[in-house]
């Protein structure tokens, strides 16, 4: 059984150790091969362990950090003053081969900047990207990138995102991934110059199964396995989708589950429907990967609860086992060779 170690920024996110520590303990029971190092305020972490009646052992270790990078800290400032912070120390563990992956629910811009500075980019990669799965019909999923790491992207960067996203998705799908560019229409004449140029590049690439443009209303139809866009569009799209999903689920709860009797009736009459709707809960897909780096970094939502943060840990374990950075590097090299010849 492959042993693996994950470093967790225990102080990141809205709830810090109240979420990260229970999620880490839960993950240890799910993965016997897993070791976890939580980094943060030792007293705050120990308090949560006491609440859980959990005694640290050889699979759970604590590393004390002196500071936390705030949610409003500018990436440039985070780079200058990050030493001793829980986020920087978690990334450093990956860089120093002391951990196979790291997870943080902290400041996204700081995480991207520190990861890029510390871990460096894979050969040939211009920019890293945030990628995460979205639910689609028939209980399938579509991977979308970029989700906010890069506000604007040129055609070459979008092309690289398509290659990297394909490789990540195919490690789960076990087949060729269908790739689409998010656009304001499906016709070839639609879109800005970057999107049009990227479409030309993808059409010429035999290694990628490019199916053309896709509009926002088709994202959840399962038409494409990978959807590519710049980080501004991707982040707005993701946050809007999550907001609608939460609104729908909250409305469902308020109308159907106001008493034990109504809960019973709802479960009896609409059990399958309710189970299906729970699949829309964004918490199930928490854990966006920062791909294109020489190491594995997973970004959790800042508002994640224990279950959601646990899903981010699962994503990190998945990527370690499949050696995602190495596979992406090999795929990019193969595509570059194809384009050269």
Curated annotation (Swiss-Prot):
Disulfide pairings: none
Domain of life: Bacteria
Main enzyme class: transferase
Catalytic activity: a fatty acyl-[ACP] + phosphate = an acyl phosphate + holo-[ACP]
Keyword Lipid biosynthesis: yes
Cellular component GO terms held in the UniProt record: cytoplasm
Pathway: Lipid metabolism; phospholipid metabolism
Family: Belongs to the PlsX family.
NCBIfam families: plsX
Protein name, as recorded: Phosphate acyltransferase
Organism, scientific name: Aliivibrio fischeri (strain ATCC 700601 / ES114) (Vibrio fischeri)
Lineage: Bacteria, Pseudomonadati, Pseudomonadota, Gammaproteobacteria, Vibrionales
Gene that specifies this protein: plsX
């Amino acid at each position: 059984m492959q042993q693996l170690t994950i470093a967790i920024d225990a102080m990141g996110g809205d709830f810090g150790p109240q979420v990260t520590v229970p999620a880490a303990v839960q993950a240890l029971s799910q993965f016997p091969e897993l070791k976890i190092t939580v980094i943060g305020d030792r007293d705050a972490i120990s308090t949560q362990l006491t609440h859980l009646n959990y005694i640290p052992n050889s699979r759970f270790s604590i590393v004390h950090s002196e500071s936390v990078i705030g949610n409003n800290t500018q990436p440039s400032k985070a780079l200058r003053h990050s030493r001793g912070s829980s986020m920087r120390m978690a990334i450093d563990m990956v860089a120093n081969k002391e951990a196979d992956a790291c997870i943080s629910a902290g400041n996204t811009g700081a995480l991207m900047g520190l990861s890029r500075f510390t871990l460096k980019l894979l050969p040939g990669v211009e920019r890293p990207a945030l990628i995460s799965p979205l639910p689609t019909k028939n209980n399938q999923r579509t991977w979308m990138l970029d989700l906010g790491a890069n506000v604007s992207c040129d055609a070459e960067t979008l092309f690289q995102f398509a290659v990297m996203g394909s490789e990540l998705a195919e490690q789960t799908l076990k087949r060729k991934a269908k790739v689409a560019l998010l656009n304001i229409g499906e016709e070839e004449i639609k879109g800005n110059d970057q999107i049009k140029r990227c479409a030309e590049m993808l059409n010429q690439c035999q290694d990628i199964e490019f199916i053309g443009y896709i509009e926002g209303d088709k994202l959840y139809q399962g038409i494409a396995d990978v959807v590519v866009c710049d980080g501004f569009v991707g982040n707005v799209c993701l946050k809007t989708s999550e907001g609608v999903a939460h609104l729908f689920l909250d409305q469902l709860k308020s109308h159907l589950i106001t008493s034990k009797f109504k809960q019973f009736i709802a479960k009896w009459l609409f059990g399958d429907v309710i189970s299906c709707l729970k699949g829309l809960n964004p918490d199930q897909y928490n854990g966006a990967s920062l791909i294109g780096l020489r190491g594995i970094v997973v970004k959790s939502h800042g508002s994640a609860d224990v279950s959601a943060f646990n899903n981010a840990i699962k994503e990190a374990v998945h990527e370690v086992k499949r050696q995602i950075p190495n596979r992406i590097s090999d795929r990019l090299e193969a595509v570059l060779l194809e384009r050269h010849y």
